[in-house]
Amino acid sequence: MNSENSKITFKPNILIKGVYIFVLYGMCICIVKNYFKTQLFQLLAPAIHEKSKNNIFMIASDSFPNLYKQNTNYRPAHPLSVASKLPTLLAWLPNRSPLHFQLIWLPIF
């Protein structure tokens, strides 16, 4: 057997294709998951509403109106307050696996 033919060589094109397929696969999973989740909630919404009329946990909202009242003092976050949290976010990211990072951040894009 020829030693040159049996030698395994590293091909960067395979690595690039693998990353590309991994990203596309993750995006497809997120799109399909979100689609079915919204379809499921649209189908179940009338049933959940009907069931919640007699549900003791839903009645609790009448007992604690302060927990459920609408916040009339809502203001959007100031851009600098969001930017101040960026170092914390960047410190948190390296501790996560690539799959976790992909599943969390891909729906944003």
Swiss-Prot record:
Entry keywords, A to Z: Membrane, Transmembrane, Transmembrane helix
GO CC terms, sorted: membrane
Subcellular location: Membrane
Bilayer-crossing regions: 12-32
Membrane topology: Single-pass membrane protein
Extra information: Partially overlaps ARG81.
Designated name of the protein: Putative uncharacterized protein YML099W-A
